[in-house]
């Protein structure tokens, strides 16, 4: 793990961060528990960068609340679009609707989990 460059003459700091698959699994767990707009947005961003993958699905199944990979049922209902705008528009330039984000996340998880749920 690389050191964080100190801003003064302190001991080197260390920062442990999750891998992309671990972050994807933890964000999916957060979505399961609270269905917050920021969780869906983060999952959408992870999906568009290819991080909703088999490894993330396995981590979610092993450490998440359902004891199984993410299923489409977890992504049935998008946040209200007004809430989506209110929560996120002040933080970033939204280029996706809540419904589009939900569909993207659901589709990426479906693809990622296919090899885990379909017999070979």
Language model features with spans:
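Structured mid-to-C-terminal alpha-helical surface segments
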Residues: 1-120
